[in-house]
């Protein structure tokens, strides 16, 4: 809180909170003061409920760094306090604002700070260091601020701290203090302090995306290219800041970071300064401004040659060509300014300062906790004592405790891991032996009847590498360094040593996550072809978010028979903000989730009705399947064979020494019409209303073909993106179910606050009522979770992690296809014009990618080893798909009788889900693995059997309850021989 309702200042501990001076996404900065002794402070108030685990880690890192270091050019953290709802960082107050404001307004630092100016600076005296008329700062001031920044960076570098967010907004200014003046610095020059160490520990997906969207002007090109980068990225930022101080504007400017990178690359390391413009160019500019009636520009001021050389050496695109830190610290620009101020310096002050710079590196240990305090209102006469809030470990967010981190190493691979809640100094525990819960008994066959589906036992499935090595697009990093484009950030992990905060210079960022956010930003900023409000075809994903569409004239091609809806449509506000209303959100009766999702469990390769005789095919999936058939072999799948994803899980800090698997699913224990739940999710995935989703497929695709707003290439792309999104969705839901068995709280569950906020955004009351019941079921699970086996919980977390990684691979593949499509339509200097629908799809993919990434990080934090069941992720998916299909077959066999009033929606959604999961196995995706020929034939047999059952149900209930579409429509993906009378050419028509 910042102010009381009556406008009185508030008190936190020994500090009084005054007016607000800054604001961000997760924190507000207020001016304040300490009561005894009275001194001004800046109080950063962080709202705890807004912090994700990643942001909490960032805050923890910032606190740890600021507590461990003390330097005159780094903002001092005086105290850290917390209440039940806020965290308060009390820092030194820099009264003159930040460098960005100073460059822009070039104000008097004393006047800005509200202080009396020294006698030499009173009005009437000529400024000692006047600023250039055309912009920028006085060169002496520039050299001073650069020298101070270099001192701070040198101090941090000796302690293995890389700031990663150097920009003028994070360089705070104040009038010089006594210690600063004792070093010989002039009184007219501001003292600079580096602030905001939120990025110093590691760069998560959400913060990187925010940085890319907010302030890319000072980012190194290797970051903009999504490459592995080292500490030299800070040097590029220093060069950009130095250029802006000298000239008055950044060296490169653009509307978005994609265009910014293009301009940097076009510059070819040729940095031009205003004073280097030719006389002819200046004359043409003056004539142009005169014609427009604008005031003439002042002549550019000269820039010293040594400053130009330094800037050009810092702003080199390739890090290997960029000057080193040692060369930067010894550059003439810095050494000359040190020589300039040394004659006026006090020897004792210089000696103390140099000792500080050379001091032994500090051991930075994350804070083990922050003391609780009370917040009270400051009265004019008396103060009301605040009540100490209770310390609740059950409901409040966790304290900023030390989290162990580990790096992919031989010890991690052999099983010598560190316990999740222990620091690196504690003894490593031996690997656990996990219980084996998955059998490997499989037989082949392809019976089409539900009885056979129910009795069938699947054969062993084998996935073999189709190409050696690790693919470029893989989501997990391997051991090779020659492919920097394939690097990854270890989910929440970094090397932590006894005397090192980072341990290594290199910081691995998750390339694919950056690409997803980058492409989404590019499309959001690019021109889009927009239709009129009445004529624009709704987005495929927005239609999925909106539920079934009401019948309306012109909503489908004239040739399409009407689709009968047996229930009211689900209404969800059509919002382009994908973070709040996501496409593919679950229908009513869904299990709570961290984001509203719809179970669009169909895929382009599964049965679905169509309108107008049109079928949307997934060309990419077909090609992948054909490739699998060519490259596969009939070898069996040994139990101890580990997939590429499993082999490379060392990037997550996990070992592969465990054996066994996770808990059995609730679906295998009891299946009934009243309690059928996909994936056996304890918090409840009721299928009562799920048929509404399936019924909308024909309408959705019919409308997609009813307009000529998009060309064929984009329509094919959108269809492929939907298919990949659906595969990613079912795998993510499967992973959610594994976590929900053991963890009632986390990103895989929906908070009550999000539930209520979603209700106000347009979701029907029926959804809210069902979600309430789902939360009640979840509470039952949470009540029993305290008695679960921690070994089983760890195994389930590892399995969920592998499923999330597979889901991320499909989402990344969708982004890659979109990126190629956009690049093929771009021209130099002219961005591609994309449809609003494609932008909506990409925004949804971005939201889902970040969501699944956070879930994967959550799962990784709950496991330290990789059990055999998680290593064989293909087997996990196959087992569950067959289990879901069997449950549907049993339900159909026992209840589908004439006159029984049976609702087929449960079976339809279950069959669709199983089909999508099996289709994901036939699509190798990012792990560059191909199934053996026997496995492909076996899975294909299951897919055909499921398709036949789907078609039978659609034929039987085509005009009644649970209808998926109009009678006579052909399902997508069913082979011609699967249904008599349907030609292959018709089934494969675009």
Curated annotation (Swiss-Prot):
Return the broad EC class: transferase
Active site at which residues? Answer: 165
Record's signal peptide: none
Q: Which UniProt keywords apply?
A: ATP-binding, Autophagy, Cytoplasm, Kinase, Membrane, Nucleotide-binding, Protein transport, Serine/threonine-protein kinase, Transferase, Transport
InterPro entries in the record, alphabetically?
A: Atg1-like (IPR045269), ATG1-like_MIT2 (IPR048941), Atg1-like_tMIT (IPR022708), Kinase-like_dom_sf (IPR011009), Prot_kinase_dom (IPR000719), Protein_kinase_ATP_BS (IPR017441), Ser/Thr_kinase_AS (IPR008271)
Can you say where in the cell this protein is located? Answer: Cytoplasm; Preautophagosomal structure membrane
User: Which SUPFAM superfamilies does this one have?
Assistant: Protein kinase-like (PK-like)
Keyword flag Transferase: yes
Q: Per the record, what phenotype accompanies loss of this gene's function?
A: Prevents vacuolar accumulation of autophagosomes and affects survival during carbon starvation.
Sum up the protein's function in the record's words.
Serine/threonine protein kinase involved in the cytoplasm to vacuole transport (Cvt) and found to be essential in autophagy, where it is required for the formation of autophagosomes. Involved in the clearance of protein aggregates which cannot be efficiently cleared by the proteasome. Required for selective autophagic degradation of the nucleus (nucleophagy) as well as for mitophagy which contributes to regulate mitochondrial quantity and quality by eliminating the mitochondria to a basal level to fulfill cellular energy requirements and preventing excess ROS production.
Which named protein is this? Serine/threonine-protein kinase ATG1
What species was this sequence derived from? Mycosarcoma maydis (Corn smut fungus)
**What gene does the UniProt entry assign to this protein?**
ATG1
